[in-house]
Design a protein with these regions (language model features):
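Gly/Ser-rich catalytic/binding loops embedded in alpha/beta enzyme cores
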Residues: 1-144
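Fold-level recognition of mixed alpha/beta catalytic cores in primary-metabolism enzymes, strongest
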Residues: 106, 127-198
Length: 198
């Protein structure tokens, strides 16, 4: 799906080349009767300000273009334990400072409902990737609307949790005292599911 629509939408900054291998490993677990996590086989995108070990984390900035995260954010560790498949890192306003996802050093994302319109931001890539069925869920971050705004613009569900509910360890945050990691999905039920896991 990413290959067929993302040239036009530009939700993704990078795609995880090992995603299919991860899926095959989950298939092996199922065939062998091993217990699988609650997210088994779910393709999930991650805003590019959250650390995934050994993966580029750019914050949509040329300043961090070659930064490779040395550890996993807590939310990533939790989703890995649930057998989530990280499909890739998604676009955002540079350092999460914006509400349109036009201010990425790697180019703007487009609204999947009308590419002449902005998708909102700063978690625009998250909302676009979910709305256009490139993934089932995404994690974004929200200081003053950065999950809720693009969710509204792209007709998805976005939730900013109460401050302190979700660990921010491994988030390169814009405003440490108020920023939260939150899920974006296509339904309220899926958002609640993701929130309970992270």
């Amino acid at each position: 799906r990413i290959n067929s629509v993302d040239d036009k939408l530009h939700a993704f900054l990078s795609v995880n080349d090992s995603a299919l291998e991860q899926a095959r490993n989950i298939d092996k677990k199922i065939k062998s009767g091993e217990k699988v996590g609650a997210c088994f086989g779910m393709p999930i995108s991650i805003k590019d300000n959250m650390c995934i070990k050994d993966t580029k984390t750019t914050c949509a900035s040329k300043m961090l273009e070659n930064f490779v995260a040395p550890y996993d954010a807590t939310v990533i560790s939790k989703l890995k334990k649930q057998d989530a498949i990280f499909i890739g890192k998604v676009n955002m306003d540079e350092f999460a400072m914006g509400l349109t996802t036009e201010f990425s050093a790697f180019g703007p994302s487009k609204n999947p409902w009308n590419i002449e319109h902005v998708p909102g931001g700063s978690s625009g890539g998250s909302a676009v990737s979910v709305s256009s069925y490139e993934c089932i869920a995404s994690l974004g971050s929200d200081t003053g609307g950065s999950v809720r705004n693009p969710a509204s613009f792209c007709s998805t569900v976005g939730y900013k949790p109460t401050y302190g509910l979700i660990s921010r360890y491994g988030l390169i945050s814009y405003a440490n005292s108020i920023e939260q990691i939150g899920p974006l999905t296509r339904t309220v039920k899926d958002t609640a599911f993701m929130l309970n896991l992270i």
